[in-house]
Amino acid sequence: MSDHDPRDLIVIALSGVQRYITESQTTADLRAASQIVAHLASEAVDHLKKDHGAEMVFPSTGVQGGEEAKDGIPNRVVALIPAGQGAIAATAVKKHLKARWKGWVEAVFGEGLETPGWPVIYLASVSFGSRSYAEAWELAQRSLAERKNIRDFSQPGHVSEELCMLSPRWRAVNKENVPSRAPEHWKGEQLAVANWVKRLWGRDADGDQRFPSTNAIASLPYRRAVLTLWENVPGVPELVQRLHDAAMTEPLASDPIKETRTPGLPEQPSGKVPRWLRRRGSRWIYPETWHVDALARECTDSLDEADVLKTDPSFIRTVRSGERAARELMELMVAEGVAPPSPHLAVLAHDVDSMGKYLSGEGEGQDRTRLDLSRGHEEHSKVSARLARTATLQRAAVEDAGGVVIYAGGDDLLALVPAESALEAARACREAGDPGLPHASDGLLFFHHGSSLQRALNSAHELLEEAKEIDGKNGLGVGYIRSSGSNAKCVLPWVGRETQGPSSVQSSPVDSLELFVPSASHPRARLSPRLLSDLLAQRNHLDGGPESATQDQYEVLRYDVARRVMKKLVLRHTSLTPGSGGTNEHSAQNDKAEKEAFAEQVTESLIRMAPKQKLIDENAVRIALFLRQEAR
């Protein structure tokens, strides 16, 4: 576009998107919120093109469309409009989006109810006049920032309803207004209008929008192994049949939650029971699911009814039978070299660093190039195409790792991944980034499938923000939250520093962390949790201890000596699960060599994850131990 092209530049931004998406109770809520945002952005694009003759810049023409666009279109829309029509078109788009949202609300409730503060739509329109595209872009960004600083505290009048359980900034819908189409088991939930639209989105949109649950994603590697060994290991079909029979006995069979098929599971074997394992069987393969008191409460509407059910001999027999089948199946799989089902999965939040500076031509891509906005809007159109290609590659990378994508826009991504392959997915998404775009940072949070999804999402985004605070950004924030509430986190640069010891040239913290994932390295090796306390007990002598310690009180060992001591401690807490080679002398020698090799790699990896001039980072050690125990 020439500097004197007679058109207007408009920028439309949907704000509050991350908040609306993360205020989700289930994975289906999460997916629906993402699709609602994507549909709003898509509506803006369609309206601009059809009603205002717009030339799209973000997303550029030809990059949207198909299934992937439903959750991959960016929440930023940029277009060129005939001169003098920019402000009119921007206002019309805002009105159109508000009307579309109102229509979705009416489809759920049968009437138009207010949703103060959602959706939030910011507009900026700039007439070119004698301005260049670069000048118009800069002015539009300033105008947009100024509009965002003007807070609109739109609130309804005084109402007495309870606060929404997901979004306490809103009041919940009263019982009389709960959508009639809501399933019976949802009608007791205190949800605001906007969250009822989210909850029922899959039932009102075209197609089946159900989404795998957290326990389905966490158990995917184990269920895949069960299905793979189905026809080759005697006992597997019979034990899964017993699991199925127990789970399909009343009142357990009346579970109203319909589980969708988890992507990544083999199509064979066929039949009713394998089909059940691919869908509703995900929660029942965990022995801990089969708890009499918990299931009695789940299957009844009151505590009094639960007290009666948990003393019912028939109910107790059913639960005990299911627990035995799950435990025997786990023991059989372990004997075949398959780890027990992990109760954990991970949230992966990925975001390109300094995207605003890059789009303004002030920041560099990974290839050290900058955008030249003097060439006009084509520079941004090329970026849009790069983002679309990146989103496609990242989606494939997550799916290859057994994960499911919530949204992927090229500059950001949110996904749920099994614990076993979470680090693999994080690295693959990074490698899928276009070299012309800036580096990206990541937040990776491991959590128990029965824990709060909303807390996990918020924690993953907090880790992402912390990763962006390190020097140069380009970081990985990783942490975990156990079902007990215990947690740890650390932030590491993607490109590591050189260490003094013998290095295997591990340049990324993922390389160091991945050593602790059993399926990635030394699957027989185990680390005792007591390693942490021993390392902390010797920390002052190994590296001087934490910064708060009085340095003069301790004699700090020379680096090579400290490293040997550290390796000795690691070796002391390393054990191997039984192998298939028996107990002869040759096997014993092999085991000793494997333990030595594992201890050497663990020592090197822990040092690489420690701050400069230190050998130990307490939280990094905690995460390493967690991965070795739970990322299976």
PLM feature spans:
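Regulatory and interdomain segments flanking nucleotide-handling catalytic cores
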Residues: 1-632
